Each structure stands twice: as structure tokens, then as C-alpha cells.
């Protein structure tokens, strides 16, 4: 490790211990070496004993910086992993991150706009940030060109070196995991960190986020379910993004939603519909749908509409992944575990030599207890989590797009059941999945595929005769080459047979001549002739092997 990495590691350990986060480790897992190591750091006591554990965890992650804050944001929706008091504190990381100086933000905006003063492009620029996140900060203004209210998102200054330094350290730690944990190699920690790095680096490029938001807005144009604010791409750069300012109720503010008369059941169901529409219709889904990025319009509470922001992380599935995923869900809820196992093999998610019977039994063992709950209480996200964890025991490769999907599905479920605890995800999603699968087979699907491919075939039609001629010529040449190789192999086989025969004869004559020369000297030159013949036969046989 470099001196800088050692200092950073020391800071991380000191931060964790000063907030007493060693309490998160179960006592049964604290081995003697760990206990001795903790005693050796006696000068790092818990300095926040008066605070609850959840608050201490939040403050520690906040102190460690953006890499750890994003990690905490991801964990905030995993209420199956933490008690409510910890999950509630982690959720605060989404909205309450200390802002950086507004003057620095203004300077960055001016640099992005070619060095011109902010007043040349915007009116009513507010130096006080509207919101502050782990990666970026948002300020409000009005466009000078048309007077529309906008928000300006700017990346935190000098954030990239900090992220890279932390990620480099995490990579080093990840390489130790297989040595420290018996199951560490199968977890592929380095690949997990690599995917996490890609996600973080992508979030630092606001041009990418702008393009994502424009695409998502186009996909849901005039939709009654989701509104995506307009992006003013002429003002956007890698470090700055300008988009329409929206007014809505945070989706986590259930009390205000109810006070506004929102149809909570319809709102929860529309969240599920929006997610499955993005995944299966558009193959392009918002993959960071935590409560801080979702609002609900004040207008028409009886027919509520979501407002989505922060499109820095998106995911996509190819056609085959979508089909296998939809069929997996339906097979699972029909308790057809054999079908689930076969789908994993057919899709290539697990190796083709996987024992399907063993895989089916493993899935049944893990998933059957889920059905002890009423169907309405079964979590899609946990279904995927259980399936993927089981499949990883059978050497399932890490599928980044499926990891993003599973994480997003947990977000959607968490929000939906917070809005309407009786939400039946399966009842809401099943018609959509069955309709989508039905749409992928039969005459309509064939007609659609022909329409999609028609321009390609029209373009390639003039080339077909030449391609056919080239193919026939190559086939003829290939056949000639195959025949030539076959003849050479046959000739080589014959030569090898002759060589072995002559070598055997030569060895026999040499041995016989030597024996007679020693035991029957009265035979005169006969043994010498035998030895000479054997040597000639052996030399001829040896040459045939060349």
C-alpha cells in the first residue's frame, strides 16, 4: 500500500471505531485475533455512546465521503437486512448531506459556460443550494432566454480523486476476501467492486445523465403514470446539467400525500406498472429509484402521477434476458421449479453442464418456504434475491443488469408497500407479464419481426447473388482443402504403419545377429549379414517417420 492508502485505511478504521460500529459484528463472529486487534486499538474508543447505533452508522458513512454515502443509500431500502431504526437513519443519507460552498458551485457553472458570469445565462440564481447529494449539488434559477424555472446540478469539486482513492483501497480489500472467507471466491468481490466503480464513474458524467433523462422522458411522453422533467441540453456539460424545476410531494411523505387526497392504492400499483413498463416495453429502466428521487404531482390526486428525477443510473435488458426473466417469475409463482432451473440453464446464466435435478432441488428447498406467506405478502425482490443466491452456488456468473434490476425492484416494492401496505405485487404484475410473453410469440410477433427486419433485407437483397456465389466458391474450396487434408492424413497413416513394421523387423534382425555372433561364432559372416540387414531396415523405417 502507498502511504496515502495507509492513511486512508487508518481513517476508515478510526471512523468506524470512534462511532462504535464494531458492535455490528455478531459476537459469535469475533475471533480471538479480532478481539486482540480491537484491544490493541484502545486509543480509539467509541466517542458517541450517547447516540443510537443507526445514527452512528449514518454519521460514520457521511464522514467517510461519497463512496460510502452511495453504499448507505443502496442499503437504506434493504429493510430485510436491518432493523427499522437503522434503515430509517440510512434513509436520511438520501436528502441530508452537508452542502459545499455555493460560491464554488457558481464558479463551476461559470467555467462550464465558457467563463461568462452566471447572470449572462440565468436570472434569480440562488447561491444557497436547494438540495445536496453525495455526488452533486442543486441550485435554482430562471433561464434568461424564456424565464422558465430550472434547477442546475453541479458535480462536487475535486470529487473524482477522492472516489478513485477509495475505490483503489476497496479493490485491495476485495482481493483479500477470498483469503479470509471460505466462500469468498464464489462471491467474486473484485467483479462486484468493478461494477460499483462503473456505476459511480457514470454518475460523475452529467452528459450521460442528461441523455438518460431525455430518453426516459421520451418513453413516457403523455403518460398518465410518470412525468420526467425537461432537460435543457444546450446548457449541459460533463460537470453541469440544467433541467426543468418541478414541484411535487416526496413519495416518502405519506402524511402529506394522504392529506392531499391521493389515491394511495392506485399510486402504489402505478409504481409497479411503471417499473415493468420500463423493463419489458422499453428495455430501459431507472435504476436509482430510491425515495429521494421520486415525487408525486400535486395535481389530480385521484389520478396520481409520479415525477422521476436523477437518471444517473439506468439499466437495460436484452430481449432474451427479458423473456427468461418473465418466464422465471411466472414459473416461480406457479411453483414449477423444474422450469425455473431449465430457464437458468437455457439462458446461459448458469453453466450448460449444471445438473438440472440438483439445481431444481436447491431452488425448491430455498423458495418453497416463501409460499407459507399469503401471495400478496411475497416480495418479488426477495424472490429474485433467493434465486440468484441459489444460482451462484451453481457457478452463476455475475449479471450486472440483473443485479441492477433486483436492486430497483426492491426499491419499487419498498415504496409501494410504504404507500399501500396491502399492495399485491403479483396481482398487479402477472397480467402485464403474461400479456408481454403472449406478445412475443405467434403471428403478431412474427409479423412484427418481419417488419423490423424488412429494411435490412431490402438493403441486402442486391448483394445476395454475390454472397451466394462467394459462399459456393468458398464451400468448393473448403471441400477441396478437406479432401487434400484427408489424403495427406491417409498417406501419413500408411507411412506410419510401414515405419513401425520396418523398425520392428530391423530391431529383430539386429538382436538376432548380435545373439548369433556371440553364441555361434562358427556361423561365420551370417550374424553380420543379419545385423547389416537389420540396420538397413531400421534406417529405412526411421526415414519414413521424418
From Swiss-Prot:
Q: Which SUPFAM superfamilies match?
A: Protein kinase-like (PK-like)
Please, which domain of life does this record's source organism belong to?
Bacteria
* Keywords, comma-separated and alphabetical: ATP-binding, Cell inner membrane, Cell membrane, Kinase, Membrane, Nucleotide-binding, Transferase, Transmembrane, Transmembrane helix, Ubiquinone biosynthesis
At which positions is ATP bound? 130-138, 153
What's any GO biological process attached to this entry? ubiquinone biosynthetic process
Class of this enzyme:
transferase
Where, by residue number, is the active site? 288 (proton acceptor)
Q: Kindly name one Pfam family recorded for this protein.
A: ABC1
> Gene Ontology cellular component?
plasma membrane
Q: What is its EC number?
A: 2.7.-.-
Q: Where are the transmembrane segments?
A: 501-521, 522-542
Q: So what family is this one in? A: Belongs to the ABC1 family. UbiB subfamily.
Among HAMAP family, the record links this protein to:
UbiB
Spell out the protein name for this chain. Probable protein kinase UbiB
Q: Which organism is it from?
A: Citrobacter koseri (strain ATCC BAA-895 / CDC 4225-83 / SGSC4696)
Amino acid at each position: 500500500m502507498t502511504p496515502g492508502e495507509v492513511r486512508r485505511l487508518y481513517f476508515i478504521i478510526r471512523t468506524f471505531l470512534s462511532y462504535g460500529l464494531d458492535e455490528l459484528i455478531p459476537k459469535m463472529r469475533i475471533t480471538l485475533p479480532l478481539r486482540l486487534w480491537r484491544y490493541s486499538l484502545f486509543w480509539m474508543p467509541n466517542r458517541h455512546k450517547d447516540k443510537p447505533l443507526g445514527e452512528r452508522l449514518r454519521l460514520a458513512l457521511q464522514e467517510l465521503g461519497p463512496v460510502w454515502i452511495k453504499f448507505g443509500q443502496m442499503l437504506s431500502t434493504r429493510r430485510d437486512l436491518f432493523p427499522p431504526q437503522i434503515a430509517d437513519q440510512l434513509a436520511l443519507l438520501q436528502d441530508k448531506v452537508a452542502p459545499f460552498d455555493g460560491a464554488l458551485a457558481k464558479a463551476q457553472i461559470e467555467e462550464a459556460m465558457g467563463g461568462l458570469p452566471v447572470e449572462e445565462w440565468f436570472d434569480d440564481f440562488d447561491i444557497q443550494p436547494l438540495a445536496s447529494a453525495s455526488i452533486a449539488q442543486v441550485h435554482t434559477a430562471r433561464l434568461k432566454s424564456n424565464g422558465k424555472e430550472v434547477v442546475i446540478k453541479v458535480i462536487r469539486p475535486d470529487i473524482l480523486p477522492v472516489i478513485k482513492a477509495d475505490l483503489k483501497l476497496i479493490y485491495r480489500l476485495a482481493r483479500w476476501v477470498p483469503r479470509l472467507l471460505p466462500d469468498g471466491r464464489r462471491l467474486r468481490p473484485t467483479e462486484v467492486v468493478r461494477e460499483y466503480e462503473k456505476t459511480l464513474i457514470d454518475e460523475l458524467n452529467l452528459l450521460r445523465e442528461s441523455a438518460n433523462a431525455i430518453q426516459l422522458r421520451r418513453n413516457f411522453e403523455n403518460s398518465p403514470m410518470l412525468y420526467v422533467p425537461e432537460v435543457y441540453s444546450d446548457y449541459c456539460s460533463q460537470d453541469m446539467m440544467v433541467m426543468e424545476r418541478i414541484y411535487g410531494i416526496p413519495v416518502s411523505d405519506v402524511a402529506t400525500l394522504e392529506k392531499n387526497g391521493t389515491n394511495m392504492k392506485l399510486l402504489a400499483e402505478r409504481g409497479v406498472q411503471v417499473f415493468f413498463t420500463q423493463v419489458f416495453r422499453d428495455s430501459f429502466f431507472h435504476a436509482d429509484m430510491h425515495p429521494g428521487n421520486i415525487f408525486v404531482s400535486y395535481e389530480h390526486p385521484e389520478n396520481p402521477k409520479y415525477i422521476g428525477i436523477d437518471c444517473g443510473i439506468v439499466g437495460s435488458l436484452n430481449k432474451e434476458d427479458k423473456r427468461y426473466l418473465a418466464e422465471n417469475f411466472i414459473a416461480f409463482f406457479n411453483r414449477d421449479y423444474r422450469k425455473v432451473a431449465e430457464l437458468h440453464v437455457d439462458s446461459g446464466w448458469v453453466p450448460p453442464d449444471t445438473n438440472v435435478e440438483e439445481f431444481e432441488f436447491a431452488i425448491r428447498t430455498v423458495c418453497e418456504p416463501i409460499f407459507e406467506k399469503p401471495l400478496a405478502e411475497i416480495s418479488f425482490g426477495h424472490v429474485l434475491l433467493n434465486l440468484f443466491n441459489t444460482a451462484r452456488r451453481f457457478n452463476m456468473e455475475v449479471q450486472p443488469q440483473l443485479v441492477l434490476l433486483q436492486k430497483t425492484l426492491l426499491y419499487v416494492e419498498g415504496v409501494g408497500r410504504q404507500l399501500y401496505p396491502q399492495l399485491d405485487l403479483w396481482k398487479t404484475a402477472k397480467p402485464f407479464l403474461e400479456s408481454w410473453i403472449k406478445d412475443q410469440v405467434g403471428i403478431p410477433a412474427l409479423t412484427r419481426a418481419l417488419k423490423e427486419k424488412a429494411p435490412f433485407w431490402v438493403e441486402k437483397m442486391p448483394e445476395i447473388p454475390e454472397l451466394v456465389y462467394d459462399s459456393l466458391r468458398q464451400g468448393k474450396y473448403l471441400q477441396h482443402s478437406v479432401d487434400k487434408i484427408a489424403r495427406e492424413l491417409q498417406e501419413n497413416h500408411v507411412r506410419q504403419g510401414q515405419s513401425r513394421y520396418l523398425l520392428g523387423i530391423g530391431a529383430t534382425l539386429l538382436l538376432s545377429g548380435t545373439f548369433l555372433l556371440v553364441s555361434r561364432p562358427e556361423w561365420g559372416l551370417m550374424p553380420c549379414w543379419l545385423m547389416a540387414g537389420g540396420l538397413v531396415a531400421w534406417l529405412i523405417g526411421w526415414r519414413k517417420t521424418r
